[in-house]
Design a protein with these regions (language model features):
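Active-site-adjacent segment of SDR/Rossmann-fold oxidoreductases
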Residues: 5-6, 113, 117, 133, ...
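Substrate-binding pocket helix/loop in short-chain dehydrogenase/reductase
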Residues: 84-85, 92-97
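Residue(s) in the substrate-gating loop at a strand-loop-helix junction
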Residues: 128
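C-terminal helical subdomain
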Residues: 189-281
Length: 281
């Protein structure tokens, strides 16, 4: 809806599957498109799955055929199949990677020829602190979301000469998907209660900004939105180094390097709640 209020025509893609990718329902996409049209905007509902390259391409083709061009792609399709690592099935791994990472690739790839031809465009990919920091029971989701960061960085570098930008957002929000996250421990239940206070409409202003010409100088960045707080993440950078002229041995690493590095080592059990321990603002 915020895109509409800023003059953008919108292709609403949502096959209407459940939180784990099951089923399908035209209702969510069509309802959103109808709401945009009722408010005086232009919109069209596309029900294709981003996991299918042809379906992903149809999202872009619908935009070009109905509205004449495409200026921004928001890759936010997602499902969850959370389970502890030793119980995760190959199917649960593939399904989550396919929607998040492959879906991001498929839609972005389909838009790229148009962006190159017009020498402009903006990719906005949804990542997660589950990938940036880590989370229990989400090996598939974490891998996909960190993979999206790598994809975005490469797109930003490869497409800069064509005037195309690529950025990531890690959203904190209660949604149809996050509602399916198991909450069995006190810590998980506390996280869910925090998420319930954060709505998706708080993410929209940054998405619209990054899609706009006002953000022409912004690319290859990782942001997060947590209610009224916008966060800029650093990329991994060296924080300590140690040189030994004669080279290292396993014994000297244990005796010298690890004690020197220990104050700066990340905690082994670190999750998002350790980095964001405070209530959303």
């Amino acid at each position: 809806m915020l895109f509409r209020s800023h003059g953008a025509a919108v292709i609403v893609n949502d096959p209407g599957v459940g939180g784990g990718g099951e089923g399908g329902d035209a209702g969510p996409a069509q309802q959103t498109a109808d709401d945009i049209i009722a408010a005086g905007g232009q919109a069209y509902a596309n029900l294709a799955s981003v996991t299918d390259p042809i379906g992903a391409a149809s999202i872009i083709e619908d935009a070009v055929q109905r509205f004449g061009r495409i200026d921004a792609v928001v890759n936010n399709a997602g499902i969850l199949r959370d389970t502890i690592w030793h119980k995760m099935s190959h199917e649960d791994w593939r399904a989550v990677i396919d929607v998040h990472l492959n879906g991001c690739f498929n839609v972005s790839k389909a838009a790229t020829p148009y962006f190159r031809e017009q020498q402009s465009g903006s990719f906005i990919h949804f990542t997660s602190t589950s990938g940036l920091i880590g989370n229990v029971g989400q090996a598939n989701y974490s891998a996909a979301k960190l993979g999206i960061v790598g994809l975005s960085q490469s797109i930003a570098l490869d497409m800069a000469r064509a005037g195309v930008r690529s950025n990531c957002i890690a959203p904190f929000a209660w949604s149809r998907m996050t509602a399916s996250i198991p909450a069995e421990t006190p810590e998980a239940k506390e996280r869910v209660e925090r998420l319930k206070t954060m709505s998706a409409d708080k993410i929209a202003p940054l998405v619209v900004y990054l899609a706009s010409d006002a953000a022409q100088a912004i690319s290859n960045q990782i942001f997060a939105v947590r209610k009224n707080e916008i966060v800029l993440f650093s990329k991994p950078r060296p924080i300590r180094s140690m040189t030994k002229a004669e080279g290292w041995t396993p014994e000297s690493i244990a005796a010298e390097l690890i004690p020197a590095f220990t104050p700066d080592l990340a905690r082994a059990d670190e999750v998002s709640a350790h980095v964001f321990p405070y209530d959303p603002i």
